[in-house]
C-alpha cells in the first residue's frame, strides 16, 4: 500500500505523467482475493439469464396458459415471488443454505452466521468469484424454484397463501437441500 502511494506521488510530480500514474495504479493494485475474471463474467451472465427466465420468461409463459381474466394474477404472483424470495434469501436463506456448520455430522442447515448477509463482504470470495456474486447467482435459483411451482396451482390459490407456501418452501425445503 505504501509502495503504491509512493509511486503515485512520484509520478504526479513529473509533468504530464497522469497516464503513467494511472497505469501504475492499475498494475500495482490488486483485489484482496484471487478472482477469476472469466469465471466471474460467466457467473454474471448466468445470473442474468436465470433471472430473465423468471421475469419475464416464466411469468409470460404462465400468463399464456391461463384464462384472460387470470393473466394479471399470474404475472403478479411471479413478480411478487421474485421480490419476496429475494428478500427472504438475503435475510436467512443464504445463511441456511451456505452457512458453515463446522465438523458436526448430521447438521441439516447451516449456521446463522450470515443472517442479513452479515459476514459477506466485498473482499470475500467463493470458488474464485466475489461472494456477493455467488449470493446473487444462488438467489436466482431460490427465486425460480417457487415460481416454477406457480404453474401447478395457477388460478387455484389465493395470493397470500401462495406467498406463505413459497416462503415455507424456500426456508424448509430448498435452503436445507442446498446445504446438503
Feature roles, as predicted:
Residues 1-14:
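N-terminal secretory signal peptides that target proteins for export/translocation
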Residues 11-180:
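Hydrophobic alpha-helical transmembrane bundles of multi-pass membrane proteins
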Amino acid at each position: 500500500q505504501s509502495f503504491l502511494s509512493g509511486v503515485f506521488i512520484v509520478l504526479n510530480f513529473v509533468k504530464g505523467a497522469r497516464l503513467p500514474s494511472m497505469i501504475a495504479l492499475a498494475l500495482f493494485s490488486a483485489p484482496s482475493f484471487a478472482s477469476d475474471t472469466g469465471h466471474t463474467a460467466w457467473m454474471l451472465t448466468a445470473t442474468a439469464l436465470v433471472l430473465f427466465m423468471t421475469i419475464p420468461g416464466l411469468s409470460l409463459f404462465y400468463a399464456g396458459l391461463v384464462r384472460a381474466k387470470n393473466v394479471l394474477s399470474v404475472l403478479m404472483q411471479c413478480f411478487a415471488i421474485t421480490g419476496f424470495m429475494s428478500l427472504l434469501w438475503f435475510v436467512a436463506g443464504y445463511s441456511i443454505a451456505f452457512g458453515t456448520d463446522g465438523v458436526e455430522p448430521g447438521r441439516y442447515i447451516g449456521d446463522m452466521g450470515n443472517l442479513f448477509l452479515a459476514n459477506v463482504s466485498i473482499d470475500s470470495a467463493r470458488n474464485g468469484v466475489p461472494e456477493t456474486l455467488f449470493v446473487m447467482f444462488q438467489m436466482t435459483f431460490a427465486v425460480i424454484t417457487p415460481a416454477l411451482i406457480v404453474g401447478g396451482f395457477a388460478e387455484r390459490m389465493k395470493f397470500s397463501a401462495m406467498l406463505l407456501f413459497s416462503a415455507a418452501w424456500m426456508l424448509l425445503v430448498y435452503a436445507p437441500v442446498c446445504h446438503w
